[in-house]
Structure formats: structure tokens, C-alpha cells
Amino acid sequence: VSLPALGLVFATDPAPVLPPQQREQPRLITSRNRNPYSAVDVANALGCDAVRLGSAGAKAMAVVVGEADIYVHDGGMYQWDSAAPAAVALAAGLHVSRTDGSPMVFNERDPWLPDFLVCRQELAEPVLDALRASRRTR
């Protein structure tokens, strides 16, 4: 995953080292252009600070380097936008899944992925619980 504006490139080998959690309240990273209901619901349920940022790669890497703890995307994206960020996040030991908790599946005929979750392992169940509750109320 390349972040040219920061002069950074992330790969799976060597795997990034995930820093220890540094905040009392989790930080959720979301789209700079839109704030999906699911992200708002997770932020409210977990008492998260929310930060907006650009590309999917930049948001996922913010979790990898510890600038954020949760990235929820439910607006859909193509496999080529999420495959490398998912691989790097998994290599770093993060939780990566669809927002319903099912695994990400790549190399499908239809390249569209409706949603994406990257978070610290210890936050996966609370985030998925909040996402399930969000789906029930929408």
C-alpha cells in the first residue's frame, strides 16, 4: 500500500509491527467525503473519537500504524481498492472482515465489495456487535 503524500509504502513482508493501543477511547477513521450511518453508530456505541481521512488505503494504514483503532466502510469499493490494505492489515495482526464479520473474499467474478472492516483484534467483537445493532435499527 503506497501513501505517496507521506513517502510511505506498506507491505506484508516484513509485516508491519502493530503499536500498542495508546488511547482510552478508540479512534474511528471514516471517509472524508461521507460519513456512513454504520460508522456513526459504531462511534456512538463505543464512545469513539472520529477522524476523517481520504483513501481506503490511507484509512486502513492509519489503523496499522496506530493513528486509529477502527476503520468501517460500508459504501462499497472494488477489490483492487481493498485487497492490498486488507493483506497488510492482516499481516500486522489486525481483524479484517466484512461488516457482518464474514471473511473478505477476493478474485470473484464481480469485483465489487459492499463493505470492509479493519480494527484492532480486541475491538472486533464490540465493533461487530455495534454494526449488528446498527443494521437492526436501519
Locate predicted features.
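DPxDG-like acidic metal-binding loop motif
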Residues: 1-14
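An extended, acidic
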Residues: 22-138
